[in-house]
Amino acid sequence: MRKILYYALACCVALFASSVNIYADDDDSDSFGARLSGEVDYKIMKGMHVYASEELRFFGGSDFIDRSYSELGFSYKINDHLKAAVSYTAIAVNKKEVIMPDNEEITLQWTEWRHRVSADLTASVKVGQWRFSLRERIQGTYKMRELNNYQQPQMGWVLRSRLKVAYKFRSVPFEPYAYFEPRLLLNGAKWSEESLGKNYENASFLGHKDVYFNRYRCAAGLEWKLNKRNSLDFYMLYDHLYDKEIDARKEGSIKGVVLKAPIHGISSDRLSLGVAYKYSF
């Protein structure tokens, strides 16, 4: 079994490296990415677990880690159908910019930190070999860098609702699954109706109370239970992101904050290949 585990891990590393290289060679590499993560899960007592995980995300080239997620969490299985969890995540977002002072190319790199807290409740039901689940997660993310609060809040709150279906084979240690998850922004920057038309300069800021769906995520994957303690998860993840582009600036002490352009929506799509390893004890 140990040889199988080593072989599986080697295949994962090779698959991950090849996928990142493919993305790096693509002209639109920001639309593709790869994720590599590891998790340690400790069973305190029946139904009660504490876990720690680290995830690396790659976009725009194999030589650059776009961001990393360091998470510590606690989960409790209330009964056969309900599970609750809370977690804290430190997020490091790596940035780089190329400047040309005196016709000399210089690459600047820096890290922006974010702090995230979340609480979720998962309801699940088994029908034969099928398992259906719905997870509701409330999540808050605090950005450390200075922000224009008339464009976005310092602490963003979202509600993530994940609907998942999985099938567990009787004779083989594989579990294919798929899920769909919309994300509802709860406190976006809200402006008056004039912000959408020709009279945008007369729009007024109404506070952080704009509510709209700003992300849709779906994935398909295969979980491989290597043995009692070790498991691997291979998945393909599609992300559709939507946001409102707000250009608000303060002009003088009398006029206050004004919009420099009408508010409009922007969207982007990303496709990621992921490999996750989990050790339970």
Regions from the language model: what does each represent?
Residues 22-26, 48-62, 67, 84-92, ...:
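Transmembrane beta-strand segments that form the barrel wall of outer-membrane beta-barrel proteins
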Residues 47-52, 81-86, 128-132, 171-175, ...:
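Repeated loop/turn-to-beta-strand initiation elements of outer-membrane beta-barrel proteins
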Residues 137-255, 279-281:
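Outer-membrane beta-barrel transmembrane domain signature
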Residues 121, 267-281:
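Outer-membrane beta-barrel "beta-signal"
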Residues 60, 85-144, 148, 240, ...:
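Outer-membrane beta-barrel translocator/channel fold
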Residues 44-46, 73, 78-80, 122-129, ...:
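Outer-membrane beta-barrel proteins
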